Design a protein with these regions (language model features):
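Single conserved hydrophobic/aromatic residue that forms the stacking wall/gate
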Residues: 355-364
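A helix-coil-helix interface module used to build multimeric assemblies
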Residues: 2-208, 213-219, 226, 281-283, ...
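Metal-dependent nucleic-acid phosphoesterase active-site entry motif
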Residues: 55, 341, 356
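Charged, flexible cofactor/metal-binding loops and thiol motifs
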Residues: 127, 135, 150, 158, ...
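Short, charge-rich, low-complexity alpha-helical interaction segments
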Residues: 15, 344-350
C-alpha cells in the first residue's frame, strides 16, 4: 500500500531530501495533464472494482475509494479542487485528495498498479475519445464541402497545372478533390483505433504484478477490445502517439493546401473568388485592402503540427526500454496538435459555409 502524506510524492520513501525547486518546476506536468482527470478517475474506479472482484480489497474499502473518487470528480468539474503543483501531476493530486477524504485506505488504489500503466491507460482513453471528436469534425467539414459542390456543379473555373490555366473544370469537381483528402484523413485516425483499443492496465511498472488481477474485467469495463500482450512493450510503446500526430499533420497539410488555393484565387493576380467580409481583415494604413488573414492563419499553423510530430520522433529515437522521463512530453505534443486541428477544421468549415448560399456568384 502506498502512503502519501505531508504532500510528498509517492516515490519519496527512499528519497530523504526534497527535490530541487527548478527540477520540480520542469519535471511537473500538472498544467498539461490535468485535462486527463476524468479518464484518470474512471480508470481508477474500474481498477478498484477489479480489486474487489478479485478479493484483494474488501467491500468497505472499495466503496470508500469509489465515493472519494466521485467526489473528487465533482470538485474538479465545479472548479473547487485544491490543485497543488508540488504534487507533480494530476494523478498525484487526485491520490493526495483521496487520502484527505478517506484516510489511509486510499493507498489501496495503487495495489497492483504503477503510474506507468495508470498514465498510459488514461492517455489511451482520452485519445480514443478525441479521435472520435476529430472524425466528427471532419464529417461536418466534408458535409459542408459536399453542399458547396452540389450548388456548383455547373460553375466553370480554370483547372491548373503549374499554376497555369490548363483545362476548364467544374468548381464542384475541384472541391470534391478535398472531400477525398479529408476522407483519407478520417481513415488514418480510424486506423489508429486498433492500437488505442488495447488495454495497458495491469502491466504495472514493466513486468506485471504478483497479485491475481483480472485484465479482461478492466478491458471490458473500460471499453477496450483486448489487453496488451507484452508488458515491457506496453510501458515503452508510443507508436499510437506517432500515428495520431502523423494523422494530425497529414490533415493539416490538406487544410493548408485548400487555404493556399483560396488565398491565391482571391489575390489580385487571379481574382477568381471574393471572400466574405466575415473572413477578411483590413489594413491600418491602406483602406482598399481586404486580407485573407483566417486562411493565412490556417496555412501557418501547419508548421506547429509538423513540429509536434518531429519532436515525438526525436524523443523515441534510440530510447531504450522501458519507461523514461523523456516520454512525459508525449501528452503536451498530442494536446497541442489536437487542439490546433480542432480549431483549424472548425474555422475552415465556417469559411466554406460562406460558399453554400451563393458560391456561383463568388466565382468570377
Amino acid at each position: 500500500m502506498t502512503k502519501n502524506k505531508n504532500n510528498q510524492p509517492i516515490w519519496s520513501s527512499r528519497i530523504k531530501k526534497n527535490s530541487n525547486n527548478l527540477f520540480r518546476k520542469v519535471g511537473g506536468s500538472l498544467d498539461i495533464d490535468k485535462r486527463l482527470f476524468n479518464e484518470d478517475i474512471s480508470a481508477s474506479i474500474v481498477h478498484t472494482e477489479m480489486l474487489f472482484k478479485q478479493k484483494i480489497i474488501n467491500f468497505k474499502i472499495k466503496n470508500k475509494i469509489v465515493w472519494g473518487l466521485n467526489r473528487i470528480r465533482n470538485e474538479i468539474i465545479k472548479k473547487k479542487f485544491p490543485f497543488d503543483k508540488n504534487l507533480e501531476d494530476i494523478h498525484m493530486n487526485i491520490e493526495k485528495r483521496l487520502f484527505d477524504l478517506i484516510g489511509e485506505d486510499a493507498g489501496f488504489i495503487h495495489t497492483a498498479r504503477s503510474r506507468n500503466d495508470q498514465v498510459i491507460t488514461d492517455f489511451k482513453i482520452w485519445l480514443k475519445k478525441s479521435t472520435y471528436e476529430i472524425n466528427k469534425t471532419l464529417d461536418a467539414l466534408i458535409s459542408t464541402i459536399l453542399k458547396v459542390a452540389d450548388k456548383n456543379i455547373k460553375t466553370v473555373m480554370p483547372g491548373f497545372t503549374h499554376l497555369k490555366n490548363a483545362q476548364p473544370i467544374s468548381f464542384a469537381h475541384y472541391m470534391m478533390a478535398y472531400v477525398e483528402m479529408f476522407k483519407r484523413d478520417k481513415k488514418r485516425f480510424k486506423n489508429n483505433l486498433d492500437a488505442l483499443n488495447e488495454n495497458p492496465l495491469g502491466v504495472a511498472a514493466l513486468s506485471g504484478t504478483s497479485f491475481n488481477i483480472d485484465r479482461n474485467f478492466t478491458t471490458k469495463k473500460l471499453n477496450f477490445s483486448k489487453p496488451t500482450d507484452n508488458s515491457i512493450d506496453t510501458v515503452s510503446d508510443r507508436d499510437f502517439v506517432l500515428d495520431f500526430l502523423y494523422a494530425c499533420s497529414a490533415c493539416s497539410i490538406h487544410i493548408s493546401r485548400i487555404a493556399e488555393e483560396f488565398i491565391i484565387w482571391n489575390s489580385d493576380a487571379y481574382n477568381l473568388i471574393h471572400l466574405n467580409d466575415k473572413i477578411v481583415t483590413g489594413s491600418s494604413i491602406m483602406p482598399q485592402k481586404k486580407n485573407p488573414d483566417p486562411l493565412e492563419y490556417l496555412r501557418g499553423k501547419t508548421g506547429s503540427s509538423f513540429g509536434n510530430l518531429f519532436s515525438m520522433l526525436t524523443i523515441l529515437k534510440g530510447l531504450p526500454l522501458s519507461y523514461f522521463k523523456d516520454l512525459q512530453d508525449d501528452k503536451e505534443l498530442v494536446f497541442k496538435s489536437y487542439d490546433q486541428l480542432k480549431i483549424s477544421l472548425s474555422l475552415l468549415n465556417d469559411i466554406c459555409l460562406l460558399y453554400t448560399s451563393d458560391a456561383a456568384d463568388d466565382i468570377r
